[in-house]
C-alpha cells in the first residue's frame, strides 16, 4: 500500500452471516481533498465508515490511515480524525456550548476558543441559553458537526451530514465543508444518499 494516501483500504469486506455489506472495497484518499461516498440506503456506506474508524471490525481486508494499519494503532491515529457517524449522545438539559465543553474536557481540547470556532463554523451561537432538547433537527445536526471539528482534526469522516437540514442548511453545510478543505487543508470523506457534493 502507498503511504502517500491518508486512507487506503485493500479488499475491505464486511459480512453478516451470508450477506456481504461491503465486498472487496479498495479506497485511495489523498490529502487535502473531498471524497464523496455515494449510494442508496443499505449500500454499505455507514459500515465502510465504521470500519475506517475502527468501530466495526472487517471480516477481511485491511485499513491503513496515514500509511499505518488501523488495527493496533487506534490510540495514535483516531485522535487525528473527526467523525460524525450517527447522532452523538448530547445531554438534553444542557446548551450546545455546555455539551461541547463536556466533550472538550473528555478529549483534552485545551480552550474555549476551539468550541467557539466550531460553533461559528456551523452557524450556532456560542452564548445561547437554548437547551439541546429545544433544538430543531437541523440545529442538532450542526452541533454534531461542530463536535466533529472541535479538536481541529486532519481528517474528517462524515456520514450523511446534511440529514435533516432544509435547503439553506444544506447549502451552508456544503459551503463550510468546502471551506474546511480549501482554507484549512482538511481531508474530508462524506457519504451521501443523493448527489449533493460541495461544488
Regions found by a protein language model. Give the residues of each.
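ABC transporter nucleotide-binding domains
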Residues: 4-7, 14-190, 195
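Single conserved hydrophobic/aromatic residue that forms the stacking wall/gate
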Residues: 197-199
